[in-house]
Structure formats: C-alpha cells, structure tokens
C-alpha cells in the first residue's frame, strides 16, 4: 500500500497505479484532487477509484460553500473542466474564476469566462457584471455557475446577450448553470474544447493487473 498524504499534482499516485500498487492519496484542496482525477483518467482510461470529501449533492456543495468559498469555487470550476484562474491564489479575481478554451471553427482558440457564486442570494447585477467581464477580456462567451437558483430577471438578462455563431452551431453568449444542473449532468453548451487547455497525461500500458485504490 502506497500512502501519499500530500499528493499535490499526483506524481506518486500515478507511479503507484502504473506499477499496479494499491494506494491512498490525500490533499486538502479540491483543486488538487480534481487535477489528480483528470491525470488518472487521462493516463488510465476506465480506471476505478473512490473520492471522499468532495460534495456528492447540492447539500454537500452548500456546506462546502459555507465553509470555504475558495474551495467551493475551485471545486465548481473543475465540474465544467475549466482552467482555474489564478491557480491557488486567493483574493480579487476581476470577476473571473475559471476559463474554458474552445475552437469555434476547429482551428482558432477562443475563451469563455467562468464566474462562480456560492452564496444563497444572487441577482441580475451579477449577470450584468459577467457580461462586462466577457467584453473587457475579449471573450466570446460567459458561464455563470451558481449554487442558488437564478431569478427571472437573471435569465432575462442572460438572454439579452444574444447568441454566438460558430461552425458547430449557435450557442447562448451568457449561460446560467446551477450546481443542481451539474449534478444532473447538464453543463454549459459550448463549441468543441481546445484539447491544449489542460496538459493531458499520456496513456499508460494497461496490461498490468491493477487493484482498486482509494483517493
């Protein structure tokens, strides 16, 4: 059994899995855990493991948001495979919590701004703010991830932003996605992602017999 109590970017866990060892990895940040999950899934397609300590439902997400808003932001950003903005730094983010890169024509890379709100009260002003950030940053789209359900005026304001025409179809420029939506498998509608957004781990040889680990 390999125990890595500070698994960070997952190098030790990756090596243990490649060698067919049982392992347990521990980290205090949801950002690190989500990146390790992605690394393992890329390197070992079909791998099975358990993740403990991350929200499994809306109530769990609300508890995380109440305990630590930054951990909630990093966790929520990982659910839409966005690149965390500013890494693990805490503080002013200019209205940007994550970035999603995509290729609207299959060649040129563009971006969507992700804004996360874990509070119980959300308002139309937050959608207007996201629209301003999208314009300021030269982004093509914006995604508003919220724990609380959006209000009618928020939905109306998002609709006013119009649509983004791409070679792969038409997409709403501003989209509101709730945590409940994400748990139901309903994420933002976007053009094909840019595979270079995250550095992908190379696939490993699956010929070795492996045992089911825990994370």
Locate each region found by the language model:
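Mixed-charge (Asp/Glu-Lys/Arg
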Residues: 14, 24-215
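Class I SAM-dependent methyltransferase "Motif I" SAM/SAH-binding loop
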Residues: 6-10
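Conserved SAM-binding loop of SAM-dependent methyltransferases across substrates and taxa
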Residues: 11-21
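Conserved class I S-adenosyl-L-methionine
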Residues: 1-5
């Amino acid at each position: 059994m390999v125990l890595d109590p500070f698994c960070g970017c997952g190098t030790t866990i990756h090596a243990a899995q490649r060698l067919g060892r049982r392992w347990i990895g521990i980290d205090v940040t949801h950002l690190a855990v989500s990146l390790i999950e992605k690394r393992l899934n890329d390197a070992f397609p079909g791998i099975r493991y358990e993740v403990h300590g991350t929200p499994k439902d809306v109530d769990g997400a609300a508890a995380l948001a109440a305990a630590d808003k930054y951990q909630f932001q990093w966790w929520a950003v990982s659910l839409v495979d966005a690149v965390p903005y500013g890494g693990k730094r805490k503080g002013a983010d200019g209205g940007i919590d994550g970035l999603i890169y995509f290729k609207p024509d299959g060649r040129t890379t563009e971006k969507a701004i992700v804004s996360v709100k874990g509070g119980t009260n959300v308002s139309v002003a937050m959608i207007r703010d996201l629209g301003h950030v999208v314009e300021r940053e030269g982004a093509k789209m914006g995604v508003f991830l919220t724990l609380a359900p959006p209000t009618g005026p928020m939905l109306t304001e998002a609709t006013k932003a119009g649509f983004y025409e791409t070679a792969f179809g038409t997409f709403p420029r501003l989209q509101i996605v709730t945590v409940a939506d994400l748990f139901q498998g309903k994420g933002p509608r976007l053009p094909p992602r840019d595979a270079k957004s995250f550095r992908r781990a190379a696939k490993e040889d699956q010929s070795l017999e492996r045992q089911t680990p825990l994370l």
